[in-house]
Amino acid sequence: MQLTAENLACVRGGRDVFRGLSFAVKSGEALMVTGRNGAGKSSLLRMIAGLLRIASGTLALDGGEQDAAIGEQAHYLGHLDALKPALTVAENLQFWAEFLGPSSGDVAPALAAVELTALADLPAAYLSAGQRRRLSIARLVAVPRAIWLLDEPTAALDAASQTRLADLMRRHLASGGMIVAAAHGAIGLERAREVKLGTAA
């Protein structure tokens, strides 16, 4: 599997955010998107996920035309954790597993992967910021998809949780998955190639 971008351009509010961006990511590879605030890192991930319109250029999976196929193969982990406060930890993950599907229906392994098993019956309203982030990361495990689009994935995570995330990412790549991540610092993807965006919005 290969994700290819050719001459991508992003325009927000009538202004160029970036233009002429090209890259390719194959199975087992990771791409780090870096750049200052406003350079378009989050916008690029949203474009790949199909959540933001591409001003010009193309995105293709395995050489096909851009369509819903990329979004169907991708997990997008953005800044918002998108949790329902009244639902328990397990219920929140079950909701997302059913929404994103198909999944096995058993969210216990995903909760264990982010060490939230002990909090499975706790309403999400009582979670700390780091625990909420870990619950969002659990979606990556609960519903396997080939492409992980991670926007500042280590935000609010303590050192132990960052180590667990790095291990999950390494396993994903080893199994043939791919990762495109946006971050200001290291997130545990030592062998990732880098694309630096330099044009402020």
List the predicted regions and their residue ranges.
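Helix-to-loop junction immediately C-terminal to a conserved catalytic motif
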Residues: 49
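Conserved ABC transporter NBD signature motif
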Residues: 54-72
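Q-loop/switch helix immediately C-terminal to the Walker
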Residues: 80, 85-100
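Conserved ABC ATPase "signature" region
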Residues: 104-120
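Conserved ABC ATPase signature
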Residues: 123-130
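Hydrophobic anchor residue at the start of the ABC signature
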Residues: 137, 176
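Catalytic Walker B motif of ABC-type/P-loop ATPase nucleotide-binding domains
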Residues: 148-152
